[in-house]
C-alpha cells in the first residue's frame, strides 16, 4: 500500500488467488488494510470463501449459483443476475478456460531452452491414429468454437445488470501447468489467426 497506494489504476486489492487455510487471518488483513488506506476496495481471496469484510467478491460461484458458465446452448437472452445478487459487487473469475486443439505450426517457435514436447506427443498420437492430415482442421474448428464461447460468455456478463465485471483466465495459452490451450493468442502472445483484435473487442 505504501509503494503503490497512489497509482491511479490501484482500485482493488485482493489478498491472493484461490487461497486456502484460515480465512480469519485473511479477513483480519482486509480489515487492517481498510483502516490503513480506505481509498480502494478490498477482498480476502478469489474463488474460495466470501468473508464479511469483503467489499467485492471475485469467484466462479456465489451462494446463489454459478457466475462463470461452462454449459448451455448458444443464445442471447440469458445473464447471471440471480447468481450475482449478493451483498457486494461480484466479478466473474477466470472466464474462458475453453480448450482448443494445438496448432502444430507453433512448434517451430520454440527455439530456446524450452521444447514443445507436449505438442510433439499430441502430434505423434494423431499420426499413430492416421489423422495427422486433419490437424489443421481440428485446430481451426475448435479455435472457432472457443472464440464463439468467449463471445457468448462475455456478452452474458455484460448483460448482467448487477455484475461487477469479469476477468478472463487469459488471452494467451498457459504452458506453465500442463497444456492449457485456452487463449486466442499462443504462448508467445502472438495471434493464432482465429479472430481479429477488432472483432474480439466487440464483446470484450
Residue positions per predicted region:
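Proline/serine/threonine-rich low-complexity linkers at boundaries of modular beta-sandwich domains
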Residues: 194-204
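Substrate-binding/catalytic cleft of secreted carbohydrate-active enzymes
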Residues: 1-185
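Histidine-centered active-site microenvironments of extracellular/periplasmic hydrolases
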Residues: 190-192
Amino acid at each position: 500500500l505504501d509503494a503503490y497506494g497512489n497509482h491511479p489504476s490501484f482500485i482493488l486489492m485482493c489478498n491472493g488467488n484461490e487461497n486456502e487455510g484460515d480465512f480469519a487471518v485473511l479477513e483480519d488483513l482486509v480489515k487492517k488494510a481498510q483502516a490503513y488506506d480506505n481509498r480502494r476496495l478490498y477482498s480476502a481471496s478469489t474463488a474460495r470463501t466470501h468473508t464479511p469484510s469483503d467489499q467485492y467478491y471475485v469467484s466462479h460461484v456465489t451462494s446463489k449459483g454459478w457466475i462463470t458458465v461452462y454449459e448451455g446452448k448458444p443464445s442471447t437472452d440469458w445473464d447471471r443476475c440471480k447468481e450475482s445478487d449478493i451483498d457486494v459487487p461480484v466479478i466473474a473469475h477466470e472466464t474462458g478456460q475453453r480448450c482448443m486443439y494445438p496448432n502444430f505450426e507453433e512448434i517451430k517457435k520454440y527455439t530456446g531452452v524450452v521444447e514443445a514436447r507436449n505438442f510433439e506427443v499430441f502430434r505423434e498420437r494423431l499420426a499413430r491414429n492416421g489423422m495427422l492430415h486433419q490437424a489443421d482442421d481440428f485446430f481451426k474448428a475448435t479455435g472457432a468454437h472457443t472464440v464463439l464461447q468467449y463471445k457468448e460468455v462475455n456478452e452474458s456478463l455484460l448483460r448482467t445488470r448487477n455484475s461487477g465485471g469479469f476477468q478472463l483466465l487469459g488471452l494467451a495459452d498457459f504452458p506453465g501447468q500442463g497444456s492449457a490451450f485456452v487463449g486466442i493468442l499462443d504462448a508467445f502472445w502472438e495471434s493464432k489467426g482465429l479472430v481479429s483484435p477488432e472483432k474480439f473487442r466487440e464483446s470484450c
